[in-house]
Amino acid sequence: MKQLALSLIFAFPFVVFGQERNEIIQQRVEFIAEQTESEDIDLTNIFDQLNYYYDRPINLNNTDAEELRSLGLLTDVQISDVFLHIKQFGKFISIYELQSLKYWDLATIQLVLPFVSVDDRFDQMHISFKEAMKNGKFELYTRYQNVRPLKAGYQSVPDSILNTSNSYYHGNDGRYYSRFRYTYRTNISVGLTGEKDSGEEFFKGSQKNGFDFYSAHAFYKGGKYLKSVAVGDYLVQIGQGLNVFSGYAFGKTPDIFTSKRTSNLLRPYTSVDENRFFRGGAAVLGYKNFTWLNFYSQKRIDGAGVADSLSDDLEFITTIDASGLHRTNSEIAKKNQIGERVYGSYLAYQTTRLSVGVAHVQQSYSSPLVKDTVPYNIYAFRGTTAASTSMDYNFVLRNVNFFGEVSYNSTNKSFAQLYGVMAALDPRVSISLIHRNYDKDYYTFYNNGFSEGSNTQNERGTFLGAKVRLNSAWTINTYADYFSFPWMKYLVDAPSKGNEFLFQPVYKPNKVLEIYARYRQQLRQKNSRDNDGTVTAIEDVVQRNYRFNLSYKVSEAITVKSRLEYVSIHRESNAPEDGWVFSQDIVIRPKSSPFDLSLRYALFDTDSYDTRIYTFENNALYVFSAPSYYYQGSRAYILLRYSFLRHCDLWVRYGTYIYADRTSLSSGAEEITGNRKTDLTVQFRVTF
């Protein structure tokens, strides 16, 4: 075995030992930002996972399939390759041995290297208090953000108007964030997070306790029989997300392997999304190949309805508000109006190649949910309680990974089904095939299955993707997705269908240059803008995006990135619209300097908001920016990071928009007078 390791070292001297942590994490986050098309997303939990493994890489000689899956960078076939290698040749002696794995190409190795290691020492099962305090990691973050000029909602008005109108915000324009967290390896995590959104009060009025949102957790992992336990806020992720999958999951991206859900079963919650998490307690027990999860959650969520004169709860609920914003009178009135209780159990049998599990989840609101009786809501969930039972599987047979889940809602007597196959047809060719069928009346509170729509409901579709590595420099990523919606949707007053195609060739001849082009076409059916007021016809809406992206590493310290993107939209009832964005980035990260610098200048010109283009932006650690550029104008920002006193970091980012065709921005309480808008982020971190 040692001879094999040595021969690999000399045979493959060109392997690049990893990319910069920020570059790798940005690539993953950028995929998510593009898919969500949201300007304000919180991906802390995903970032935490990669960030942790960068600081403390996974020991390939002392790991399991679940831990490797949690990276989100490997397929199950590639994970199976690791354990097959150990079975045939023994423990890894050198990290270079990864090149001998059949389904690990150089791109995969370079992507994963910063997060894995080879060591013959094993982590100890027993953790002493002294060891935990000595080698644990403490982190403290504090952050301030604002946007100027002040929006209309921040005008100073008399209390008589402020307390009766929904046009003004009760708090100032600052957005505050603080977070404390202690971690010891992946075994222990204790944290407290607080956040105030812009416009919310702080230590006064409706927020006398300071932050509008608090989140706390205590988490332990590592016992033989008590595998993990969580108290406070946590995430539960089971199977392919048809029954329960709290937190965020990837959707369709150029990386076809992200179409499969990677479930982490039980994790601490560290984000500030005020909805998609559980609050209570959970534990995972293990015996031999069996894993048993039990969890209970009870919390208050936002919503509105008809008040009950005999209790604090609503008589019935008409809307559930997931914005997490409490700035105006109406938003404050919705806060914590609904009681939510979720509990469940999951039993799984797991080996290196096989996993089969069964879950049952019971979910209830404090009052019946009764949505508006508009046609598209006919099959929406109504009532107080929903119960669902699911079965999921994951099986690796040689170079093929079979996976899927079937979930049954006994309340509505409806099903959600997903079946998938990922196969490495050749070390250079991989495919992903997924078929889903979600009944129009299927409903669970925390589903998050692979879908075109925003819910795991009212959808049928088939996704086929491929990744082809032509040679060491060229890679092709492509997919096609055909889908239909058996019933109406919001702004679609008839059953509809659509499709989506993506083709992305990537040229990366070495570690300093990467060029890719992307063509993406989306066809969706929406209500026609031409109607007689009685019957609304639907029409095809075709959007095409063309992108050219270049990244060049000028030196070890300097990277330049250029991007040009063009979008066009065609629909029968409207004239064609289009738009473009050109952005130029410079990133300076000298290894011997305490300073990092990121700069961007962008020009954009689009016909309307419909032709907006979302673009990832660098920001402070744990701040995720994906703003949309639309109308005519320019965008620029500068981000400076300063590391000092060994344990301290300071980030300062200042950005500005200048619009050439606007005299005011947005409307209502969000309106800004003038054609300029600036944003500021200041964040401080101390670790010890």
Question: Which residues fall in each region the model found?
Answer:
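Bacterial Sec-dependent N-terminal signal peptides
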Residues: 1-23, 688
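Alpha-helical interaction/regulatory segments in DNA maintenance proteins
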Residues: 20, 37-51, 88-89, 99-136, ...
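Amphipathic, charged-and-aliphatic alpha-helical interface segments
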Residues: 43-93, 112-117, 196, 200
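Transmembrane beta-strand segments of Gram-negative outer membrane beta-barrel proteins
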Residues: 127-164, 182, 186-192, 229, ...
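Exposed, low-structure sequence patches enriched in small/polar residues
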Residues: 169-173, 276-278, 333-373, 378-688
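Outer-membrane beta-barrel proteins
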Residues: 195-213, 267-274, 333-336, 407-409, ...
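Outer membrane beta-barrel
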Residues: 209-266, 270-302, 425-444, 593-609
